[in-house]
Amino acid sequence: MANKSTYAYLGPVGTFTELALAQVKDAKNASKLPVSTIQEAIDAVLSKKAFRAIIPVENSIEGGVSATLDALANTKGIRIFGEYLVPVTFNLVAKPGMKLSDVKVISTHPTAYAQCRGWLQENLPKHSQIPATSTAQAALALLEKDSYADAAIAAKSITDHYKLTVLAKNIGDNKNAQTRFIEIGLADVPTKRSGKDKTSIIVELPDDRPGGLLEMLEQFAARGVN
């Protein structure tokens, strides 16, 4: 039986996924299990190391998270139990004493980097980038002695967890960006209807031809399904 007191999320502490987890009422007093990848989060649920997992499914700027969508399509035995929206606000952080003019190398998750590209080109046009597994991991790595990065792009809450200095606030190119997260668990766990339930489906068309997608979508319209 899955441990109902454990929730898996993409860590380490300070990620946007952790902010989504903070919205889950049933997880307020639960143990948090940080993992490195979406697949690890799903595996934690399947192996019953975690009761539920919080993973990103869609970003308003970058679109769907392919790793999550592929996992939902190919993994049997899991279902979605909830969704949570997290506003995406990025800060540029560094170790105390670092100045913005001294920044040459920036580390962050590729998705975060893409959403701050305009600001970076305008304010740090000669910088280079080091990709990280998460924005929080990029920030945490700054505190290591052999860190190659001078600064990191991370969630504004990152300074609540690590001793870092904010060099620039709200550097995202789209100030209204948000990421949608889903809460997944084993499909054999019954739940009551909430009256606000949503159904997600994955469709594979039998052939590739003009109008195929339209014909499929017309089935929803004909039956009054939004």
Segment roles from a protein language model:
Residues M1-N226:
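Domain-level signature for soluble enzymes in the chorismate/prephenate branch of the shikimate pathway
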